[in-house]
Structures are given as C-alpha cells and as structure tokens.
C-alpha cells in the first residue's frame, strides 16, 4: 500500500456555502445545449488525457487493493458535461467503475445544473439521472462520488453516517482533513460538526490521489473509507503530496 504524507500549509481555506447546493461547476448563464456527438468527443478527449497519465496509473494501483465490496454509487455535483472539469471527473469515474466492477444501472447522478443534453448523455450510457436530490442516508456498499462539492454538502451526507454507522462510509471527494486543519477548532465544530467528528475520531482512513498536471479537476481529491484493513498491507516508500488548500467550487 502507498502511504501518503500530507504537507499542510498554514493558509486557511474557508468552506463556502451555507446551503448544500451540489453543482461543482459555475453554471450561471450556461444554458447552451450540446449535441450528443460533441459531448462524446469532449469525453473522449478527456479520457485520452487520463489514459496514459501517471495520475491514473497511481489511482488504479492504489484502489485495486481495496477489498470491500462496492455495489452502487451516487454521483453528486458533476456539473455540465461539456466542461473540461466535468468531463475529466466523469472520465475518472469510468475508470473507478472498472476497478470495482460497477454496472451503470447501479450508478445514480444528481445535479440541478444538468440540462436535457446532460441527462440524455448519461441515460444513453445506462446511468440513472435522478430528478430530485437523493435523501442523505447511511448506505452500505455504496460509493459517494463527490469531487469538489461544497463543504456544506459533505457535512449533510456525513451526518447520516456519523449518526448511524460510520463503518459504511466510502467517498471519493475532497480531503476532509484539510477542512479541519485550515479552520480553528471552534469554528469547524460549530459550522461543520460532522466533518470535525469524522476526522478527529478517526472514523475513516483516506488515500490521497496524486497531482494531475495543468487542470483543476482533481485538486485535493481523496478516497475515504472506514476500515484500514480493507487494503492489503505493502511495504513501499512513502509519497508526499502538497495539499496546502482545499479545492472547492463556489456554492
């Protein structure tokens, strides 16, 4: 197993957003519809960027050691698919599906930013696109795929696990520890108590993804899971990642 040490700066990064909106893309005025062929070309281009990257090789190597079953996935806040960030994050999700043998019919997307072209594109690939936001709940064998969502949305979903059974928590999203490290304890406890509790009580282990060059799509992305024994122990050199700030889209 790769052990990754996080070097943290003293710079504070406030989690913005009072309410849990879920889109991770700035969509104001983004109302143009795109053809399915164009969306596919954009996705293909993004998948090419990932295909031979060291980033993907590292992610595949590390996640392939995860032994707990994952049967379903909820994908929140992807954003408009024509954007580079969303197409890259969707490309990574396809790779994660391969690693865990996830079937499209067990993967549900929700983002209020989606327009009919996005919905059609995802449904044509066999995914479920939810018309309404899913109710946060403690879900067994379910991956939450939430790159760069607002802190308030992480807080809302974490509450379901903290108040029920944290052992079922599996999430691919921002490195939660950075929210705790970059805010005074009193502030994080009052604003995001479940993020604080999840981190300080060691309810989960996190695996930090490596840096991806030139684009913002995967900044501070981590795989969070409860049981450290889920990974096969391997003696390998430590890796260092500079995670000085938390990537988060405006809410």
UniProtKB/Swiss-Prot annotation:
It is found in: Cytoplasm; Nucleus. Its main location: cytoplasm. Keywords: Cytoplasm, Nucleus. Pfam families: SRR1. GO terms for biological process: DNA damage response. GO terms for cellular component: cytoplasm; cytosol; nucleus. The keyword Cytoplasm applies. Belongs to the SRR1 family. This is SRR1-like protein. It comes from Schizosaccharomyces pombe (strain 972 / ATCC 24843).
């Amino acid at each position: 197993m790769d052990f990754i040490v996080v070097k943290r700066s003293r710079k504070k990064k406030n989690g913005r957003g009072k309410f849990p909106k879920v889109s991770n893309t700035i969509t104001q005025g983004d109302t143009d519809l795109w053809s399915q062929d164009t969306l596919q070309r954009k996705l293909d281009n993004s998948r090419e960027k990932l295909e031979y990257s060291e980033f993907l090789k590292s992610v595949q190597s590390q996640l392939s050691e995860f032994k707990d079953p994952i049967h379903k996935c909820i994908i929140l806040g992807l954003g408009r698919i024509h954007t580079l960030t969303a197409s890259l994050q969707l490309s990574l999700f396809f790779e994660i599906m391969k690693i865990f043998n996830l079937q499209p019919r067990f993967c549900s997307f929700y983002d209020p930013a989606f327009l009919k072209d996005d919905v059609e594109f995802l449904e044509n690939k066999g995914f479920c696109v939810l018309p309404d936001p899913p109710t946060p709940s403690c879900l067994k064998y379910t991956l939450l795929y939430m790159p760069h969502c607002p802190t308030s949305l992480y807080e809302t979903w974490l509450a379901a696990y903290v108040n029920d059974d944290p052992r079922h928590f599996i999430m691919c999203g921002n490195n939660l520890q950075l929210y705790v490290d970059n805010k005074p304890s009193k502030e994080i406890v009052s604003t995001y108590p479940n993020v604080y509790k999840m981190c300080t009580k060691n309810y989960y282990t996190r695996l930090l993804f490596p840096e991806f060059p030139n684009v913002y799509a995967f900044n501070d992305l981590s795989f969070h899971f409860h049981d450290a024994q889920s990974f096969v122990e391997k003696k390998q050199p430590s890796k260092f990642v500079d995670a000085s700030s938390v990537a988060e889209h405006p809410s």
